Amino acid sequence: MTYSEAGFQIVLTGNVVEFSGKLEKSSYEKVDEFLRNIDQTVSAPMCILDLRQLLFLNSSGIRSLATFMLGSPKQFELRINPEITWQKESIPTLTYLKPNAICLAA
């Protein structure tokens, strides 16, 4: 499953969701819908969100990720690139939303 727009792409392979490019939209309705479809499609109890190739994500995008994870019964592993400052500083706070269900991997 793939969702893409100019400048970014989200690809589901198995239970791994890879984000790439720059996600800086003002409206995330289509992204939110795609994430909901992923939640219904992935049968594994663990979903890996690979953000290592995501160069930018604005606050609305972070909210979309948070809403997706909070609304899902799955466990999540967030893979980040510690070389990208916004990922290193912003993404770890998402683990506080569901401490027993969201973990961080670099």
Regions found by a protein language model. Give the residues of each.
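A generic secondary-structure signal
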Residues: 34-38, 67-68
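Short, glycine-/small-residue-enriched flexible loop/hinge segments at domain edges that mediate gating
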Residues: 38-59, 79
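STAS-typified acidic loop motif
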Residues: 1-35
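Amphipathic, Lys/Arg-enriched alpha-helical "gate/interface" segment within cytosolic domains
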Residues: 64-69, 73-106
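Short, solvent-exposed loop/turn at the beta-strand->alpha-helix junction
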Residues: 25-26, 55-59, 85-86
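Residues at alpha-helix caps and immediate loop-helix transition turns in enzyme cores, especially N-
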Residues: 30-31, 61, 90
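Structural motif
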Residues: 20-22, 51-52, 81-82
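A general structural motif
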Residues: 14, 44-46, 73-75
